Amino acid sequence: MESFVAMKVVCIVLLFVIAAEAASTGKNPVGDAPNGKKNNITFNFPPYVPNHHAFASSLWKLCEESTPKPEMKIVDSRTTYTRRINDLQVNFKDCTFLCKRRFDNVTLDLPKNTPCGPKNQTCENKDQCVPHIPGC
């Protein structure tokens, strides 16, 4: 029981540190959609990722371009299936993300310049990256 309480305390302290870091930059980490339009989608990326919409778009593009090439299949008479990403399946500690395909999934590497910590760490040096704990 004591370790559970200690873990909650650590989690809360970590959230305050990340929030303070984001507040000190004075920037909105969510940002605008890459096409310049306002977008109401909220992503669960950490505050040290500068533009959540652009970041999600870049991951989706990497997913779409990964091999084997995506096959557009008609799921029913109204929809087609394309590859997807899930913002909860981005691992900032290991610098990977999950690309969801129609019949299989693949784990891909994040770009080397991806922020992976509140102190300007990037995926260039994975050993310095810290895990993101959403909703802690």
UniProtKB/Swiss-Prot annotation:
Function: Salivary tick protein that downregulates host immune system by binding to both dendritic cells, and CD4(+) T cells. Specifically binds to the CD4 coreceptor on T cells. This interaction prevents the activation of the Src kinase, Lck, and its downstream substrate Zap-70, and results in deficient activation of PLCgamma1, the repression of calcium fluxes triggered by T-cell antigen receptor (TCR) ligation, and a subsequent reduction in interleukin-2 production.
Signal sequence region: 1-22
Subunit and partners: Interacts with host CD4. Interacts with host DC-SIGN (CD209). Interacts with Borrelia outer surface protein C (OspC).
Keywords: Glycoprotein, Secreted, Signal
Compartment(s): Secreted
Main location (coarse class): secreted
Coiled coil start-end: none
Family stated for the protein in its record: Belongs to the salp15 family.
One cellular component (GO) term of this entry: extracellular region
Name of this protein: Salivary protein 15 Iric-2
Any one Pfam family match given in the protein's UniProt record, by short name: Salp15
Covalent S-S links between cysteines: none
Induction remark: By feeding. By the presence of Borrelia burgdorferi.
Region (CD4-binding) residue spans: 117-136
